[in-house]
Design a protein with these regions (language model features):
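Feature captures the catalytic ectodomains and active-site-proximal regions of enzymes
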Residues: 1-180
């Protein structure tokens, strides 16, 4: 028996570079996310499955691209397994990697999720995901913790996922000025 999930025809989409003018790369261990990145016209960089290996890949290829999409699967897997402690541990591992990311001096750094996976539900859910946006041009807010409730009260408020890249491009000075 063969079970095909989300099987469809290959859509014709503009590449990431055509749409946003950026050379984009994806660092992802999980095949579905590599496939989505390829569909978006990103170069898929070979990497390992740990955050340390993904960070090493990022550092090694830092000068070659304008945009990096780094996918960490462990937080999602822990949520699907209903393992709250493992989810906390995975998130803390991402937290520990942030100083190394900031040391690369990105124009913009965004940390978020593609969906919420609460350990209590053991499944993807409708809940909003927190978003951390760091750039020299960001206005500081009063948020000191990273979580759904805290981030919703921050400077970005409730942001639709389709708006995130535009906000990132604005903070990177990559949008065409409009108005006076």
């Amino acid at each position: 028996m063969v079970l095909l999930r989300s099987f469809a025809r290959h859509p014709v989409l503009p590449t990431f570079r055509e749409r946003f003018g950026l050379r984009a790369a994806a660092i992802a261990a999980y095949p579905m996310y590599r496939g989505l990145a390829r569909l978006a016209g990103m170069e898929i960089l070979p990497t390992g499955t740990t955050i340390a290996e993904q960070l090493a890949t990022l550092k090694e290829r830092w000068a070659d691209f304008d945009f990096f999409y780094v996918h960490v699967k462990r937080t999602d897997t822990a949520g699907e397994d209903g393992d709250f402690a493992a989810k906390v541990k995975a998130i803390e591992e991402v937290d520990r990697a942030l100083p190394a990311l900031v040391s690369l001096r990105p124009d913009v750094l965004a940390v978020t999720g593609d969906h919420s996976t609460p350990a209590t539900l053991r499944a993807h859910s409708w809940h909003p995901v927190p978003v951390l946006l760091w750039a020299k041009t960001c206005r500081p807010d009063t948020v000191t913790t990273f979580g759904e409730r805290a981030c919703a009260a921050g400077g970005l408020g409730h942001l639709a996922g389709r708006e995130l890249l535009t906000v990132m491009l604005a903070h990177a000075g990559r949008l065409t000025k409009f108005g006076a």
